[in-house]
């Protein structure tokens, strides 16, 4: 099979970076004071203050990979926050559609103590992701967050 013109190429593990998005405007008034706060630690690493706790950053690349994260690995591509840039990147790589998952907040909400705050943050992140995907809803397919504190 030499001709791939009729093959649909899907990135099934795409990521957006909602970590720098100000979610307060997407949260009900009574919860806005509990929105995540971004800050840097004494080594200049990005951290997040949420529920009165400082959430630590990863120090490695994952199981089976040794060594600290490099600045390049710690960063993010512009297309993770700007859907127009992502679509250009997808065109350059020949990707027809991307299934998109959140990162920083998405990996945090289910560790929160408050099931109500978790639900509010899930809704805020889902609203942001929906806006992101509106740039091309046939190609950008967001995976919503669901709070798991209250089965």
Give the residues covered by each predicted segment.
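Helix-coil boundary/capping segments in enzymes
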Residues: 1-151
């Amino acid at each position: 099979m030499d001709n791939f013109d009729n093959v649909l190429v899907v990135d099934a593990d795409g990521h957006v970076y909602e970590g720098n998005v100000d979610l307060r405007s997407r949260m009900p008034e009574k919860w806005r004071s509990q929105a995540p706060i971004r800050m840097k630690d004494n080594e200049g690493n990005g951290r997040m203050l949420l529920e009165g706790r400082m959430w630590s950053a990863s120090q490695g690349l994952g199981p089976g990979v040794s060594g600290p994260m490099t600045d390049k690995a710690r960063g993010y591509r512009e297309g993770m926050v700007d859907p127009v840039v992502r679509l250009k990147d997808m065109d350059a790589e020949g990707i027809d559609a991307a299934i998109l998952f959140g990162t920083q907040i998405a990996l945090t909400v289910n560790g929160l103590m408050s099931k109500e705050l978790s639900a509010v943050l899930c809704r805020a992140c889902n609203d942001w992701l929906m806006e992101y995907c509106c740039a091309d809803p046939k190609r950008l397919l967001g995976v919503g967050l669901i709070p798991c504190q209250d089965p």
